[in-house]
Amino acid sequence: MSNSIVGEVYHHVILDVIANSRSDFEENGVDDATLRELQNLWQSKLVATDVATFPWAQAPVGTFPIGQLFDPVSGLRTDSLDVTAPAVANSPILNNIAAIRAVQQMDTFAQQHGNSNYYSPPTPSLPQSATNISFDSSAIPNVQSNPNNTAPFPSYSSNSLQLPTNQTADSPIINDHSTANVTSTGQEHAPDSSSTNSFGGLLLPNQNSPKKSELGETESSNTTPANSRNDVPQTDGAIHDLDDAGSPSNFESNRFAIAQKADAEIYEVLKKNRILQIDGTIEDNEDEKKPPVDTPSDEAINSDLDDPDSDEAPETEEGSDIGQAIVLCLYDKVNHHKNKWKCVFRDGVVGVNGKDYLFFKANGEFEWI
C-alpha cells in the first residue's frame, strides 16, 4: 500500500467527475461558475480531512535566515540565494536587509567625521516675551503666618461672590455646576461666621438669602394639606402612619403581626387543598407511581435481533471499534466455510488511522462471530 500517490489519484478523480458533469450542467442551464464552486468546495473538504498530501494545496514558502543571506562586511550574499525560491525579490526579509545596511553606513560615516560634529539638533530658544515675566503682587492673596504650621488659605468676603441671575430666593442652594465670580482684592479679611461660603451645595447666608423663619413658613404652608389628610386613620392595609413606623418597637410589632397573618393564610390554603384518604388502611400501594401501560417491552417483536447480547459491538485490543477502518474495493474471489470467509480484493482504498492508502491486490480472511 502507498500513501504518496493518493493525492494525485483524488485529483484525477475530481477532474474526471467535473468533466463528465459539465455537459449535464450546460443542458440544465446551470452556469459554469457553479461547477467550479463545487469543485473548490470538494477540494477544500478533502484538504480538511488531511488523509493525504494534495497537489492543489498551497505549499508553505520556506523562510531564509538572515545570517545566511547577509554579511556585515560584503553585504548581501547572492550565492546563498535559491534561484527557484518564489517571490524572493519582494520578500520583507530583503527590505529589512536594505534598512540594516543603510543604518550601518550612517554609523560608519558618523564615526569617520566625529560624533560631536556630525549632527547637533537645534536647541529651541525661549521667546523674549517668555523670559520677561512680571508678577503682580496684588494678584496673589496675602498669606498670614500661622504658628501651628497649618496650610493657610485665602478668605473671601460674602460680597465677592455673585449668584447667577437665574438663582432666586426660593432656591438658595448652589449646585456644583454653578459659577461664582471671585475678585481678588489683595487684602486680608478676617473670617466671619456670617460670611462662610461654600460651593458644595450649601446655603449662602447672604443678605439677599431668605431667613429661616421664611423657609419655615413656606414648608408649613406646603405641608398643611398633608397634615389634614393624616387626621383620617388608616385601617385597610399594613402601611401605618409615619410617626408610628419611625420607632423600632412599632416596626418590630408590625412586622411580627404581618408574619403571623401570612402564616395563617398559608395554613388555610394548605388545609383546604389537603385530601384525606379514607378508602382503606394500605396507603403506600396506591400512592406509588405506576409505569405507563403503553410502553412496549424490549422483546415485543420476539426476534433474535432484539437480543441485548448482540447489541454490543466487538472491540479490538486497543479498545476502538472495528468500524473506524473502511475498505472500498473490488473483489475477484470469495470462499467461505461455515463462519470463515476468504476474499481476494483488487483496486481498492483503505482508510486507517486517519490516512488513506491505495492497493492493487489484497487478501482478506474474516470470521463471523
Swiss-Prot record:
Bias class Acidic residues marks the residues at 304-319
Residue ranges for the region (Disordered) are 113-248, 282-319
According to its UniProt entry, the protein's GO biological process terms are: transcription by RNA polymerase II; transcription initiation at RNA polymerase II promoter
Family matches, as InterPro entries: TFIIA_asu/bsu, TFIIA_b-brl
UniProt modified residues of type Phosphoserine: 249
Q: Which residues form a coiled coil?
A: none
Q: Which compartment or compartments is the protein found in? A: Nucleus
UniProt-listed Pfam families: TFIIA
GO MF assignments: RNA polymerase II general transcription initiation factor activity
Annotated Polar residues bias: 113-210, 218-233
* SUPFAM superfamilies for the chain: Transcription factor IIA (TFIIA), alpha-helical domain (SSF47396), Transcription factor IIA (TFIIA), beta-barrel domain (SSF50784)
GO cellular component, as recorded = cytosol; nucleus; transcription factor TFIIA complex
Q: Which keywords describe this protein according to UniProt? A: Nucleus, Phosphoprotein, Transcription
Role = TFIIA is a component of the transcription machinery of RNA polymerase II and plays an important role in transcriptional activation. TFIIA in a complex with tbp mediates transcriptional activity.
> What is the similarity comment for this entry?
Belongs to the TFIIA subunit 1 family.
Q: Cite the record's note on assembly.
A: TFIIA is a heterodimer of the large subunit and the small subunit gamma.
Task: Identify this protein by name.
Answer: Transcription initiation factor IIA large subunit
Q: Which organism is it from?
A: Schizosaccharomyces pombe (strain 972 / ATCC 24843)
Q: What is the lineage of its organism?
A: Eukaryota, Fungi, Dikarya, Ascomycota, Taphrinomycotina
